[in-house]
Amino acid sequence: MDRRSRPQLGRRARHNYNDLCPPIGRRAATALLWLSCSIALLRALATSSTRAQQRAAAQRRTFLNAHHRSAAQVFPEPPESDHEDTDFEPSLPECPEYQEEEFDYESETESESEIESETEFETESDTAPTTEPETEPEDEPGPVVPKRPTFHQSLTERLSALRLRSPDASPSRAPPSTQESESPRQGEEPEDKDPRDPEESEEPKEEEKQQQHRCKPKKPTRRDPSPESPSKRGAIPIRRH
């Protein structure tokens, strides 16, 4: 009875297990367990990777802030860039002011060009009167200038006077005609002597030589000291009373 009862009990237990967990249900349960485990592992890996990225970003920020203290903020992340774009948009109305500044600069350049043109016109007006007087004397009659024939006449008169004078005759014996001819010359303006006349140039040279001979002072004649001079004799004895 016992031997027959044991296998019967085993069969009954199997039937009961199959009834509770059939083979199809077992396979589905195992698949669900594997899926849940894999999903949990993937989530853990994702969280660890995000944490590692955040740590690396924090380290980069601290490194950049340490080496670039002047920069207060580090380049933002892509999601924050949209907000920054919206922040930069209000700064666009500043463009008209910049255009106005350019317009003012152009007006300043125009005023400078006008000033330069005025200065050039003033310089031209200043230089114009300097050139005009040079052309005017050509058209208008100039001042009365003594004619050349008078100069030649005076030369001929002087030559004739020199010829009349003899080397032996004194200036007191000169004829009155020469004195009369010289008297009107004194009223006239002094004229330049022609250096070609050798006779006229010789006369003033001779007169200068005579004056030099007369005015030369006589040099004091010094007698040579005799061999018996007091300097060589020695000191003069002084008599004491």
UniProtKB/Swiss-Prot annotation:
GO terms for biological process: negative regulation of multicellular organism growth; response to parathyroid hormone. The keyword Magnesium does not apply. It is found in: Cytoplasmic vesicle, Secretory vesicle; Secreted. GO terms for cellular component: extracellular region; transport vesicle. Residues 212-221 have a biased composition (Basic residues). Coiled coil: none annotated. Highly expressed in adrenal medulla and anterior and posterior pituitary. In the brain, detected in hypothalamus, hippocampus, caudate nucleus, thalamus and, in significantly lower amounts, in the cerebellum. This protein is produced by a bicistronic gene which also produces the ALEX protein from an overlapping reading frame. This is Neuroendocrine secretory protein 55. It comes from Bos taurus (Bovine). The lineage of its organism: Eukaryota, Metazoa, Chordata, Craniata, Vertebrata. The gene is GNAS.
